[in-house]
């Protein structure tokens, strides 16, 4: 049964989509079967695989709202991808009147989860119903955090949301790790931000840091991951390192 990981942070621009895609491809390089789910109405994960969300007829909106079987919206790209479309912008309103609205994704995942080792979910930059659906369906959460002070403050709100979900909807969801992104070792501000994270969250902070580089912006323009775009570059190696950390954590949990 696949392990489900959401990438969540209500602040935008923290590399959620970049991390979802590139970690998924790094897992795939290890021989693991991976499904990515684009739960963000902006559709950036879908676009990063060369697909146009505006021209997609059936998407995660139809899965969540109309109970369309998930295999019908999975495209086979670098890894399998359940796509977003512009319609997903209306999903929160449509879900709000439905019974069991927080579990729509969990129910849809049940039919495909066994086919994968990992299911990775890209969430919108909010803590609304789409993100809550992702967290309810997840075993773990990876929190990408930009290495600046204002980004750190949003972690408290996310922790509060996770506590509410544990109490009422999914007692087993846990923070898989906190990932420093946009890291620039040359600046004191970046280094201090990582220190603050480590002081407050200890071993939850990944050793891997995702550094600032234009490679992460260039790869989606080509409709591909950075691991395919620049396979031997530092940007690709960072996500291979992250994959090793996540897999080592999974092994540690199994033997705990």
Each language-model region and where it sits:
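P-loop NTP-binding core
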Residues: 1-256
């Amino acid at each position: 049964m696949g392990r489900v990981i959401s990438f969540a942070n209500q602040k935008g621009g923290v590399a959620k989509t970049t991390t979802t895609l590139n970690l998924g491809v790094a897992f795939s390089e290890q021989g693991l079967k991976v499904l990515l789910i684009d739960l963000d109405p902006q559709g950036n994960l879908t676009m990063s695989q060369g697909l146009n969300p505006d021209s997609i007829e059936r998407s995660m909106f139809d899965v969540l709202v109309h109970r369309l079987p998930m295999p019908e919206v999975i495209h086979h790209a670098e890894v399998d991808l359940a796509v977003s479309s512009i319609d997903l912008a209306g999903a929160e309103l449509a879900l709000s009147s439905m019974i069991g609205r927080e579990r729509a994704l969990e129910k849809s995942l049940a039919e495909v989860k066994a086919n994968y080792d990992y299911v990775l979910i890209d969430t919108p930059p909010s803590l609304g119903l789409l993100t809550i659906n992702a967290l309810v369906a997840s075993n773990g959460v990876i929190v990408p955090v930009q290495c600046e002070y204002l980004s750190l403050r949003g972690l408290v709100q996310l922790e509060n949301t996770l506590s509410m979900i544990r109490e009422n909807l999914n007692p087993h969801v846990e923070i898989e790790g906190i990932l420093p992104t946009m890291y620039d070792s040359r600046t004191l501000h970046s280094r201090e931000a990582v220190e603050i994270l480590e002081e407050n969250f200890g071993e939850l902070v990944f050793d891997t840091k995702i550094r600032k580089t234009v490679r992460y912006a260039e790869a989606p323009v080509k409709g591909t991951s950075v691991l395919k775009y620049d396979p031997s570059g530092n940007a690709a190696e960072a996500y291979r390192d992250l994959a090793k950390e996540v897999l080592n954590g999974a092994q540690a949990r199994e033997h705990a």
